Amino acid sequence: MTKFALVGDVGGTNARLALCDLASGEISRAKTYSGLDYPSLEAVVRVYLEEHQVTVNEGCIAIACPITGDWVAMTNHTWAFSIAEMKRNLGFAHLEIINDFTAVSMAIPMLKAEHLIQFGGSAPVAGKPIAVYGAGTGLGVAHLVHVDKRWVSLPGEGGHVDFAPNSEEEGIILEELRAELGHVSAERVLSGPGLVNLYRAIVKSDGRLPENLQPREVTERALADSCTDCRRALSLFCVIMGRFGGNLALTLGTFGGVYIAGGIVPRFLEFFKASGFRGGFEDKGRFKAYVQDIPVYLIVHDNPGLLGSGAHLRQTLGQVL
């Protein structure tokens, strides 16, 4: 008889829940709930289990915030809870709450060829470290290493490292944003809001007033070629994505590959393919040759967070992935 566990992927707006076959890792019966409609994550879980008339004893839920102990307070939502209390209230034997990019990193060993698009480099080297990053509401970062037949995710807050410009244009962007924000992290330019920051800085550096645009509007105008400033912003976004990915590759020697997740890049895939992304990735001066063969992949799986939550739980329960 198939045994299922609950898996989840929770962001600032939505909570996506599903069932994971503990034997195969297959994800099924995924459903998305608006976080605004429920007082707590526990309430959403109860509704999901009731709707699907299923009883589970284990669960793993990925959340877009740092997980440092039993108390979880979401940074972009009002939900806050004790993991131990939620586990007890739901009657679970095992409940894991993990960082969203821990889940995305754990999905990587589960992905098939059709879930990936490669951008340069050669084949990944088995057993070598892996990096994953992705722009969305923020900039998530994690690494993945294989140790003693187990995958170990190394999450952190890498999106908040300093933005490091490497061209005259990028230097001007930094000056504009520093005057407005003080500290300028990579997330300030590599995210949905970051794309708007790039657009605004480009316009302001030319002594003009920027329009009050949303990220989607910047992208749409860039792709329609109806706004030169938006197109410059999107082009710069792609190059800086490359630089940042190259930095991750250098930091941990990620010859196992660098993976891009998140919802932004797939919206302008053809533009991204023709952009300066790979050039930015390899623009490492004396260490260009070091990163040239490292492959970069865009993850195009629909639910890597759910897939990775299931993989994390299965490994925690003793399976070899």
From Swiss-Prot:
Signal peptide stretch: none
Pfam families: Glucokinase
Biological processes, Gene Ontology terms: glycolytic process
Keyword set, alphabetical order: ATP-binding, Cytoplasm, Glycolysis, Kinase, Nucleotide-binding, Transferase
Any one of the GO CC terms: cytosol
GO MF, one annotated term: D-glucose binding
Catalytic reaction list: D-glucose + ATP = D-glucose 6-phosphate + ADP + H(+)
Coiled-coil residues: none
Subcellular location(s) of the protein: Cytoplasm
Keyword Glycoprotein annotated: no
CDD domains registered for this protein in UniProt: ASKHA_NBD_GLK (cd24008)
E.C. number: 2.7.1.2
UniProt keyword Cytoplasm present: yes
Organism in which the protein naturally occurs: Klebsiella pneumoniae subsp. pneumoniae (strain ATCC 700721 / MGH 78578)
Classification of source organism: Bacteria, Pseudomonadati, Pseudomonadota, Gammaproteobacteria, Enterobacterales
Entry protein name: Glucokinase
